[in-house]
Curated annotation (Swiss-Prot):
Name this protein carries in UniProt: Carboxylesterase 5A
Key words, A-Z: Disulfide bond, Glycoprotein, Hydrolase, Secreted, Serine esterase, Signal
Organismal lineage: Eukaryota, Metazoa, Chordata, Craniata, Vertebrata
Taxonomy, superkingdom: Eukaryota
Stored Gene3D superfamilies: alpha/beta hydrolase (3.40.50.1820)
Main function: Involved in the detoxification of xenobiotics and in the activation of ester and amide prodrugs.
Predominant cellular place of this UniProt entry's protein: secreted
Catalysed transformations (reactions): a carboxylic ester + H2O = an alcohol + a carboxylate + H(+)
Compartment(s) of residence: Secreted
GO CC annotations, alphabetized: extracellular region
CDD domains linked to this entry: Esterase_lipase
Enzyme class: hydrolase
Glycosylation sites: 134, 281, 363, 524
PTM entry text: N-glycosylated.
Amino acid sequence: MSGDWVRPGQALIWVIWIFGAIIEGSVTEEPHRYTKLGWVQGKQATVLGRLEPVNVFLGIPFAAPPLGPLRFSKPQPPIPWDNLREATAYPNLCFQNLEWLFIYQNLLKVSYPILGMSEDCLYLNIYAPCHANNGSSLPVMVWIPGGGFETGSASIFDGSALAVYEDVLVVTIQYRLGIFGFFTTQNQHAPGNWAFWDQLAALLWVRENIKYFGGNPDSVTIFGNSAGAISISSLILSPLSADLFHRAIMQSGVAIIPSLKSSDNDLKHDLQVVANVCDCNVSDSKALLKCLREKSSLELMSLSQKAKSFTRVVDGSFFSEEPLELLSQKTLKIVPSIIGVNNQECGYILPVRDTPEILLGSNESTALTLIHTLLHIPTQHLYIVTKEYFHGKHSPTDIRDTLLDLFGDVFFVVPGLVTARYHRDSGGPVYFYEFQHRPHCFQNSRPAFVKADHTDEIRFVFGGPFLKGDVVMFEEATEEEKLLSRKMMKYWANFARSGDPNGADLPPWPVYDENEQYLELDVNISTGRRLKDQRVEFWTDTLPLILSASKALLSPTFSLILLSLLSPVLLSAAS
């Protein structure tokens, strides 16, 4: 993943392009930039409210295509080129089930460009103010997209508005998804975590090349939502990420979120499923890997529907131990961080996919059945959850709202707050937020009870109201929402510049210290203190202690929840 990739035969061509670029100046409709692999030609775009255009470079390779023998392998250095490379077309999507990408497009009221799909997908896009050039040394913000590690793309996000309004470079990256990104034989033949290795390769490319686009390689902030935020939280815990980034923003996702780890039994079962398809002995990893590398992309996609337990693993390299253990041992990269959640993470997008029936309303019996099924809390102990969450709740809508809040607490809010405490106690400055605004564009398309749902903050961070290109992120934004978007872009960019989101003309954002103050992001921004403190205590203290005292047999999934959330209590008691 390292080394000098310059080819001597390129020298004369580069001299010509350098001379041409000097004559042409930094502001041009066809910006040219040097990289260690060869020259690239981008294009320019504009955003609403700004005269200055933004330079856009699409589809720059940061690794060799992971095809053939490189499938289920660590990413290799990209292949250099001799001629000027056009970087004006969107790269292919990484292989994924397109059905949900299209469904999300409708549910989120966004529009994406037409994109191809291929395993040859390890590319990144760059958005830079047109004045940015070698020596500008602007802050760099690298977006790692989400999508449950199953869907997503660099090209469904447009960094133009954030770049030109805040004078930063925005880079959006791609990484392998699903079985392509996480298949493992649980040994040295295919240790797994390919998606995380892809992210490391992209960050290495940024470190070695971003200065030629006007970015500062010593001021790189990684930010992302959902699976992207989980990736960032994971990169913070990996020893391999040293010097690749300097600040981190985690939007609705951290590495200790329950359900990220599959049980050993599930992995063994799915390996056997794969072996049966390949007509191989499951113990013959080399033969199994050879068979899988000969399968078509579509065959692997079909196989992934039968074998869904391939997720992140402790491989002894990217992860030396489980994320919770690394956090508790303070084995993490100490960087300034922003961690945040939305005030109804499981309000609509997530349940409409997995449990749409509860959106119409629920009774207590149905709610408890879902809790038992999804969280594996023993039936005899569901009364504890009933007392905490459903006391005094009788109407179907009240029970539904409470149930959705419970799932949001378990999967996003409590893990986020627990992670923030670990980061704080490890010595890194932490800022926490709760996004609370329901976007106006959903006025007629979402149920009225839905507040700020999962991913709703993204359109504000990217300046969605000001975009006018192929990616439409926020039509029908109100004037108040445009102002909120400006403020959020400013907070995020200030943090990318200095590690502190505060700045002139912005409501103060307190650091997340022992007082646990946080920012409430809405059209009227305010601060709060000890977000959902009672719920955090319930999931990290009350319920685990009762279950432990009763010696209840816990499922692997729920054991992970309890371990993830109880450890801060146990550690503080031991200290």
